[in-house]
């Protein structure tokens, strides 16, 4: 597999002396030994080169958020069409019927602040759904959820501030005093 370099990451790559692959799309999610992993489609590579990667190694919060949002939308569609699908699945064997039940139970568990967990940090942000959402990592959990920014601003303002502070960049410009010092020399 050849290596591709994201131009936005050039500075980081030079510091780490390591090239980064560019994620095209997040395809799936799983939990292995308590760690969340995502199945990734790599830009410029075929589907044969898709790989499962641990969440902590990834730097694509927008793509993860987009994937989680699409899963949420797909689940809501499944609920509205649930009756029709069951009638059509009479010919399926029992092993296959139990899989959707497990997935349904898993996705009906509380998400976001409804889980009652304490926020640890914000991994990323997206507005792909038309509303600003944060990808929130929870303390004592390997899972992350999309939560509305409005809700996070009220329930954990310090976590939100930390997220923005981590991303602040300061640009220093020469002041007039510096210019005068240069003229005297």
Curated annotation (Swiss-Prot):
Residues 73-89, 96-121 have a biased composition (Basic and acidic residues). Keywords: Isopeptide bond, Nucleus, Phosphoprotein, Repeat, Ubl conjugation. Not phosphorylated. Ubiquitinated. It comes from the Eukaryota. CDD domains: CD_HP1beta_Cbx1 (cd18650), CSD_HP1beta_Cbx1 (cd18654). GO terms for cellular component: chromatin; chromocenter; chromosome, centromeric region; chromosome, telomeric region; female pronucleus; heterochromatin; intracellular membrane-bounded organelle; male pronucleus. Residues 21-79, 117-175 form the Chromo domain. PROSITE patterns: CHROMO_1, CHROMO_2. Expressed in all adult and embryonic tissues. There is a cross-link at residues 9, 33, 99, 150 (Glycyl lysine isopeptide (Lys-Gly) (interchain with G-Cter in SUMO2)). The record marks 16, 125-126, 135, 146, 167-168, 170 as: Interacts with the PxVxL motif of TRIM28/TIF1B. The record marks 21, 42, 45 as: Histone H3K9me2 binding. Component of heterochromatin. Recognizes and binds histone H3 tails methylated at 'Lys-9', leading to epigenetic repression. Interaction with lamin B receptor (LBR) can contribute to the association of the heterochromatin with the inner nuclear membrane. Homodimer. Interacts directly with CHAF1A, EMSY, LBR, TIF1/TIF1A and TRIM28/TIF1B PXVXL motif via the chromoshadow domain. Interacts directly with histone H3 methylated at 'Lys-9' via the chromo domain. Interacts with SUV39H1 and SETDB1, KMT5B and KMT5C. Interacts with PRDM6. Interacts with POGZ. Interacts with CHAMP1. Interacts with INCENP. Interacts with SGO1; the CBX1 homodimer binds to one molecule of SGO1. Interacts with LRIF1 (via PxVxL motif). Interacts with HDGFL2. Interacts with CHD3. Interacts with CHD4. This is Chromobox protein homolog 1. The lineage of its organism: Eukaryota, Metazoa, Chordata, Craniata, Vertebrata.
